[in-house]
């Protein structure tokens, strides 16, 4: 796995490795399981889980985790939940976890008990939108998640919602007006939301985008806003398997594993040359090529967007701040991508061979780099979910 982009929203980046829940190889027994900072009841449950046969699976988080979270440690294991963690949905100051038993747990600045039987959620700093039973509900964050929902839409028989933000007849957002319509003829496999734009993956692998386009995040070649879903013509004819939206950038993965990026590259989140990052590097570092890490393409890739203005005095380097149409990204060793996710100003991708993530430094980067944390700990990455300023990774022992 590799990551690119902005390392932290401010100076708040926590990068020193800290593993609270070690994953032990199969056959080591419960005596070797340590559970620091965990209540005894949950620690006992963890010991029982770790004693079960078969490879163990867990979620890890890198980067900013909310003001209520302890600082220190670049890699932190997310505390396991009974029934396992089925979904991870990060917001800026907190994260929502949906367990295999339909329970919703909130971690970070916002914590509280919400109704059970949750299938999915969309968090934001103003509301938490839930798919619960046969209804869509929006709960106001400012009320401390008490009382009833601020908005509710019951699903009629035969209607199905999800994966969120998809909903019957359109899509939902975790802020008013909550429900937005889509053209009836437009079918969707997946829909993702950026700060000011949306991207939709159709059944045939086509990609549609709409919303604000001032940073090139729509991929139509211009910077004008688009009010209705429009086909990204540059990708037409190449079936896509996945799509992701960052704050002001977009990424898609073809069925063959190729990675396409477009939009804002100020922090190198597109893995294209960034003038802003080049100016921050020491002169020697800017002129000397970085040595390639062994097996760099074998895992999760963190992507960063770079500035598009030409740099005065730069030698043979074209900097990119805005990429207004999809660009095919060459990953090291020709790696094929299986999954991709975007944060506010960073991108992470899991390759089909292995998966790694989590650079042990707070500096931004506009180069795809393998994350050595997971192979060093005998783990293979299965999934990745980016929050605005962090990255959650699901990994299993090899």
Where do the protein language model's features map onto the residues?
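Blade-level signature of beta-propeller repeat domains, shared across WD40, Kelch, NHL, RCC1
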Residues: 372-398
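Canonical WD40 repeat/beta-propeller blade segments in eukaryotic WD-repeat proteins
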Residues: 85, 118-119, 187-190, 196, ...
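Short glycine/serine- and acidic-residue-enriched loop/turn motifs that recur at repeat junctions
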Residues: 2-4, 24, 35-87, 98, ...
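Short loop/turn positions that demarcate and connect the beta-strands within blades
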Residues: 82, 90, 115, 185, ...
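Conserved core positions of repeat-based scaffolds
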Residues: 61, 94-97, 106, 127-130, ...
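Conserved strand-to-loop turn within each blade of WD40 beta-propeller repeats
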Residues: 195, 203-204, 212-214, 247-248, ...
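Surface loop/turn motifs at the tips and blade-to-blade linkers of beta-strand repeat domains
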Residues: 78-81, 111-115, 180-183, 233-235, ...
